[in-house]
A protein has these predicted regions:
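Short amphipathic alpha-helical interaction segments
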Residues: 34-45
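Residues within the helices of the helix-turn-helix
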Residues: 15, 26, 44
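Alpha-helix N-cap/helix-initiation sites
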Residues: 6-7, 21, 36
Length: 70
C-alpha cells in the first residue's frame, strides 16, 4: 500500500471513528475490503503517525484485544 492509499484509507477510518468511538481490526478490514493483516498494518501506521490511539485489553490466558480510538 503506497502513501496515497494509506492516506485515503486513513481518512475513511477517521470517518468511521466519528460514528463509533472504538474500532477493531476486523471492523476496518470489512469496511475497507482489506484482509486483516493489511488493516492491522494500516492501523499501526496511523498509531505511529499520531492519528489514533491503541488500547490493549488483556483477557485470562494469552488472549489480547486491540481497540483503536481517537
Amino acid at each position: 500500500m503506497n502513501k496515497f492509499e494509506k492516506e485515503v484509507n486513513a481518512n475513511q477510518v477517521m470517518m468511521m471513528l466519528v460514528n463509533n468511538t472504538q474500532l477493531r481490526v476486523s471492523d476496518v478490514a470489512s469496511k475497507l475490503y482489506l484482509n486483516k493483516d493489511k488493516a492491522r498494518r494500516l492501523l499501526d501506521w496511523m498509531v505511529n503517525q499520531g492519528y489514533i490511539k491503541k488500547k490493549i485489553i488483556k483477557y485470562v490466558g494469552n488472549a489480547n484485544l486491540n481497540i483503536y480510538t481517537k
